[in-house]
Amino acid sequence: MSEPWAAQTQEQRYDELLQQTGAALIGAAPQSWRRIDLIAKIAEGVQDFGLTVIMSDFSHAEVDPPAGAAQALVELRRLMYRPERGAWLSARYVLNPPGEFRIFYNYEHDPLWEPPIPAAVFQRDLATFPRPAEKVPGWLRRLVEQAGGSPS
């Protein structure tokens, strides 16, 4: 049984990581941005971050995803892992001025890595973040089985 303080500490860390992500994104964006949209695809040992910054005139600014946001999201994924559900496969962090954000987590759908990552990466990810067989999406099960592994 977990202690109430442990849950509170986890919630506090969750909030801190989301704030760190937002602060890093705002710090990397040019002045007069209208929306910041970060897509994070994370598997054990592999990460891909795509950042879109829309300016007030609706143009797009070329901005590299900041390392601080990437590090916070990698830690957030570890923190959010639950054995009964697994770890999320991708997340989308959308930020609007002055600092209002929403985050969406994908636990089921193929994050469509480009280029595709090897099945061995997903096998490693499932070994690090196991989930019950019924929580392994069909696309992921097929991919891991085709590579000769077991998805659960």
Residue locations for each model-derived region?
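Acidic, proline/glycine-rich low-complexity IDRs
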Residues: 100-152
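N-terminal "first-domain core" detector
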Residues: 1-53
